Regions:
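N-terminal beta1-alpha1-beta2 module of alpha/beta enzyme domains
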Residues: 1-75
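Active-site-adjacent beta->alpha loops and helix N-cap segments on the catalytic face
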Residues: 67, 97-98
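Conserved catalytic cysteine-centered active-site region
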Residues: 76-84
Length: 98
């Protein structure tokens, strides 16, 4: 059975050292993959009432999916990488297809 781990987008400290520690620890613990959710922009709770209870907003630091997974792929050897969602309208379709 494959068991993965979710990349802690809003909980992880900023900077490469925190990402390195998380990825290498996940790999060393035997997780099969790291799952990363895509959120290019968080919503502003003052304008969008439905997001008031969410854990991320427009002020949250959110790591870009392709850059972060590319970085993790360079520092790990066996762990798989995946996005759980990719918000295409917020990205260039040609770059996503590439």
């Amino acid at each position: 059975m494959d068991i993965g781990i979710i990349f802690p987008q809003t909980e992880i400290e900023t900077g490469k050292d925190a990402i390195i520690k998380f990825a290498k620890t996940a790999e060393n613990l035997g997780f099969s993959h790291i799952f990363m959710a895509d959120h290019v922009l968080g919503a502003n709770p003052a304008v969008h009432e439905h997001v008031r209870d969410h854990y991320y907003t427009h002020d949250s630091i959110i790591n870009e999916v392709f850059v972060t997974l590319g970085f993790i792929s360079a520092i790990t050897e066996t762990i798989g990488l995946m996005t759980g969602i990719l918000i295409l309208p917020q990205r260039s379709a040609a770059l996503v297809a590439k």
